[in-house]
Every structure is written in structure tokens, then in C-alpha cells.
Amino acid sequence: MLAHYLARYDEGRYARILTTGDIHQTNADRIGITRRQVKTVTYAFLYGAGNIKLGRSFDKLLPEEAAAQKGADIRKAYVAAIPGLAELLQACKTRSERGYANAIDGRRISVDKGHKFLNYLLQGSAATIAKRWMVTINQCMPADAHLSLIHI
């Protein structure tokens, strides 16, 4: 979903890496941390973690002040490493002022805090796609077949 929303700002770069490379390794190389660390940081960042939580996602043992500083440093490096992300975040901040996000299907998702906007947008849109996929597959299946959506 992030690739979809970044595309207008990065000319499809993120999507190309997702489909032809390893986005986590690419980001790790650009930020200067391990692939495992960047995966943890990515999800903390996308789910709206504050600087302390972001810093502790990198190193669980950091005291609060050090975690806040590390989180701020990681946030800055992460945004700088992904072309178009700063612009997407600014658009999210601007749109969050209306109190809702438009999911991929145009449906309104209520957003109570600006830092949650991107997370709500990504997860709401992903849920819409998953639900449509299940309906489509269900229509193609034999009547006695069963279907279950499992998030991995």
C-alpha cells in the first residue's frame, strides 16, 4: 500500500524495488542499519510510533531520553532514505486536518490524531483490497468450498 501512495511522489520507485528487489535491504543500506532493524523500524514508523517508541524499536534498552533522540535520528534518516516520503507525510498532515482519510475506494476513515493518518490510510486501504479479494474469490469457488483470510 505504501508503494501505491508513494507513486505520485516517487514516480513508482518504491513499487519497482518491491517487485524487483528487496525493499528492506535497500532501505537498510540507505539508512545504515541492518535489514532486521529496518524492518522493525519501518513498521513502527508506518504504524505511527513516536520518537521514544521508534528509538526503542531499534534498541529496547535505551533510556527514555536517548530513545527519543535515537528515534528522531531514525525518523529523519528514514524519511531522507525514501524518495517522496517527506512529500507524502506532508500531504497526510495537511489532509489529517479534515479529520478523515479517503481509503483507496473513497470511503472515509475517521482519523482522530494526525500522526495516525498514514497508518489508517494504509491499513484501511489494505483491508478494502483484502475484502474485495475475498468476495471475488468466493464468487469463483464451488458452493461447498470454504475460504478463510489469515493475516501473516
Language model feature labels by segment:
Residues 1-150:
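Conserved catalytic core of nucleotide polymerization and phosphodiester-bond processing enzymes
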